[in-house]
Amino acid sequence: MQSNQENSKKGQYNLNKLQKRLRRNVGEAIADFNMIEEGDRIMVCLSGGKDSYTMLEILRNLQQSAPISFSLVAVNLDQKQPGFPAHILPEYLEQQGVEYKIVDEDTYSIVKEKIPEGKTTCSLCSRLRRGILYRTASELGCTKIALGHHRDDILQTLFLNMFYGGKMKGMPPKLMSDDGQHIVIRPLAYCREKDIERFAIARQYPIIPCNLCGSQPNLQRQVIGDMLRDWDKRYPGRIETMFTAMQNVVPSHLADADLFDFKQIRHGSEVIDGGDLAFDRETLPLQPSAWQPEEDEATPARLDVVQIR
């Protein structure tokens, strides 16, 4: 009995620490990129996955203590995928007392009609979904659209573009939408996926599976994700350091002539960003600069995904 109580106290203690870290990460991202301003109405895109549930809860939590006033409205797009449990999100949101809107649009049929059997449908589905969400944001009078992408998503996108697209391009924490009418924010930009997963497990969110459409998985993204997870296990701190590198770009030491004017470097030019250090072996720390020891964790749990029958 006493052992169960101790485990319960330890579990609650770890959950509180985890929530504080997620709050801090989200708060720092909001401040660094000026994501939320006085009077904003934020459309929180809710898919039923661990990331969007966590984003909604942390934003609601911050809303109570923020020095500015802003409102939230959760939006889910029901794309009429076979077996989609349409009751899950309304029941959860009503229980939580969250303002919400469910948008019903049968994009599934459109995608199935346009994309040959066996081919990935993600690209077309994403474009259709994006347009509907932009329209919905306008209808609801929202000034910002919040998406649940986290730090691992951003790094995966960076490596996908480097390996397959020949670009140094990631996923920005804040951007202007394709139509130039909406500001899109990613409040979880500083959050680790493993923290989000642990938080979602502890909160017992009613997770909706993401493969209801039957689409083929994005194998390239899957390979990159596996690579990053392997690095995270074998080289603790590497992921943190790579993300820090994305925030410390030195254009003069890359090779993009559009980003830096190399042609103007001549005899007598000033030394820029330390000059040429190519022949000097820089002293690097034994541990990655952003490395932090892991906190004590109980036996790894698993997300309780809603069973679709």
UniProtKB/Swiss-Prot annotation:
UniProtKB keywords: 4Fe-4S, ATP-binding, Cytoplasm, Iron, Iron-sulfur, Magnesium, Metal-binding, Nucleotide-binding, RNA-binding, Transferase, tRNA processing, tRNA-binding
Role of this protein: Catalyzes the ATP-dependent 2-thiolation of cytidine in position 32 of tRNA, to form 2-thiocytidine (s(2)C32). The sulfur atoms are provided by the cysteine/cysteine desulfurase (IscS) system.
MF-aspect GO terms: 4 iron, 4 sulfur cluster binding; ATP binding; magnesium ion binding; sulfurtransferase activity; tRNA binding
Family of this protein: Belongs to the TtcA family.
BP term (GO), one: tRNA thio-modification
GO cellular component: cytoplasm
Encoding gene, per UniProt annotation: ttcA
A Pfam family that the UniProt record links to this protein: ATP_bind_3
InterPro entries: Rossmann-like_a/b/a_fold (IPR014729), TilS/TtcA_N (IPR011063), tRNA_Cyd_32_2_STrfase (IPR012089), tRNA_thiolation_TtcA_Ctu1 (IPR035107)
Matches recorded under HAMAP family: TtcA (MF_01850)
Pathway: tRNA modification
UniProt keyword Isomerase, yes or no: no
Cofactor: Mg(2+); [4Fe-4S] cluster
Binding site for [4Fe-4S] cluster: 122, 125, 213
The organism of origin for this protein: Erwinia tasmaniensis (strain DSM 17950 / CFBP 7177 / CIP 109463 / NCPPB 4357 / Et1/99)
Domain of life: Bacteria
Further comment: The thiolation reaction likely consists of two steps: a first activation step by ATP to form an adenylated intermediate of the target base of tRNA, and a second nucleophilic substitution step of the sulfur (S) atom supplied by the hydrosulfide attached to the Fe-S cluster.
Protein name, per record: tRNA-cytidine(32) 2-sulfurtransferase
Comment on bound cofactor: Binds 1 [4Fe-4S] cluster per subunit. The cluster is chelated by three Cys residues, the fourth Fe has a free coordination site that may bind a sulfur atom transferred from the persulfide of IscS.
